[in-house]
């Protein structure tokens, strides 16, 4: 019971003396490991505390009317925010800081321009799913040269996924895979 209470306290939001909330920030989490086609694959993900002064941000705005609203969500560095209720995240909220994929001895880091708009990444239990539910899924090509990460993010009404594909040749994208047409 003490361990349960201690764990709950660690996950709780902390409020500083100045009223600013602080969240636990996890770094260098080994998110997934496997060996495919004799290549060791390791995905390492880190969070960072969001600092809006280091990004170009926009607030949500209603581009419609009061009778017929058309809300456009907040953006960070020109991309829609993922992991919040379309609102601009508060300072200190866990932001996806970096993704590094190891293909054997080669490391490929996803550019910050692809991660800066992603908040509250789910860095627990990747690859754990059942017939109905999946949080985060990692897929690796049969030749071990490409990793796809479908990362669960957010909480409550802001829950979503952020997709990343990383290849051993150093390229990264947020574009989901295309299926060949018949």
What are these regions (language model features)?
Residues 3-13:
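Sec-dependent N-terminal signal peptides
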Residues 16-182:
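Exposed acidic/polar residues on beta-strands and adjacent loops within beta-sheet cores, strongest
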